[in-house]
Design a protein with these regions (language model features):
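Alpha-helical transmembrane segments of multi-pass small-molecule/ion transporters
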Residues: 1-309
Length: 309
């Protein structure tokens, strides 16, 4: 609904001006990561350490597999030079906690095992994604700053807007609400979706003002084939790799969804932090995340139904 409203009236999304919009976007990021920290289960996460081989192979494959696919697509000309950096950033995102756990359980897999790997992946993301940004992606051009200055700006932002909110969310859950009511659980699970939708709303509204509807529509058409085909290839390789990592069906299904799903909850906030909320190029980084999220939600649900049979 918010994206539809941004398409109809994009001026409303930027009516507060760049300063107010940027401050509100940072506030939303803090709330999102506070709630992500509130939902983390460190005790369950540590259970995946029982098998160090599967632990590290899975965590490496979560990033290495999509990165290899993106680079292969670029090498054969499916992904253009202009789209390479946004696609690499997308490939380096962690697995999503919510959908991979839901799909794993729905397909008869080990949902708790998926939760452990997804939790660890999301904890590592605030460190790995900025490293990938500077050492793998490193976009060039006047809109971006030198690496030393970027590190001095992005690392504090990651600590203040990601690390501390996650820690305080985890601490608040442990110290204040160790046994939350169902309503609190529901709010913690759904409020981040509202925050993500608002961030996407601001990004789309800003893009429509800067680039116009026709260019945005053309962007969607251009991205649909590489993202849709990329999701199918990632799913194929994820199923193959999951069979090598785990022999039992429950573990294999859980590993498959961990490898094949990317996090919108971390993706959009991290794009805002790395690119900058007022960057004229923000849309080209955010839109692939949004479009892939829709593709993987629909595709993941269909795969879940197939695996359930």
């Amino acid at each position: 609904l918010l994206l539809g409203w941004a398409w109809i009236d994009p001026k409303a999304a930027v009516s507060g001006g760049p300063v107010i919009t940027g401050l509100f976007a940072n506030f939303l990021i803090v709330v999102i990561f506070f709630l992500q920290g509130w939902r983390l289960r460190p005790a369950r996460m540590f259970e995946v350490w029982a098998d160090g081989y599967t632990l590290w192979i899975t965590q490496i494959a979560i990033i290495a597999t999509p990165v290899a696919l993106v680079l292969s697509g670029w090498a054969v000309g499916v992904i253009s030079e202009e789209k390479l950096s946004p696609f690499l950033l997308l490939a380096c995102l962690p697995t999503t906690i919510s959908s991979c756990v839901v799909y794993a359980r729905g397909a008869g897999g080990d949902g708790d095992y998926a939760l452990g790997h997804a939790t660890l992946s999301n904890l590592l993301a605030p460190f790995l994604v900025p490293l990938a940004w500077f050492f793998l992606i490193r976009p060039s051009g006047p809109a971006h700053f030198p690496m030393t200055s970027a590190l001095m700006e992005v690392v504090p932002n990651m600590l203040l807007l990601v690390g501390l909110p996650c820690f305080f969310g985890w601490w608040f859950r442990k110290a204040v609400t160790p046994k939350p009511k169902p309503l609190a659980e529901w709010l913690a699970g759904n409020l981040p979706l509202v925050g993500i939708a608002l961030l996407a709303y601001f990004s789309l509204g800003q893009a429509l003002i800067l680039h116009g509807r026709e260019q945005c529509r053309a962007e969607a058409v251009e991205l649909l084939l590489p993202l849709g085909g990329g999701f199918l290839l990632l799913s194929f390789f994820s199923w193959f790799l999951s069979g090598l990592i785990r022999r039992d069906r429950g573990g294999r299904v859980a590993t498959f969804f961990c490898l094949s799903q990317k996090s919108l909850a971390l993706g959009i906030p991290m794009v805002h932090l790395l690119v900058g909320s007022n960057d004229a190029e923000l849309f080209k980084w955010v839109f692939p995340v949004i479009l892939l999220h829709v593709i993987q939600l629909v595709g993941g649900a269909l795969i879940m139904l197939l695996l359930r049979r």
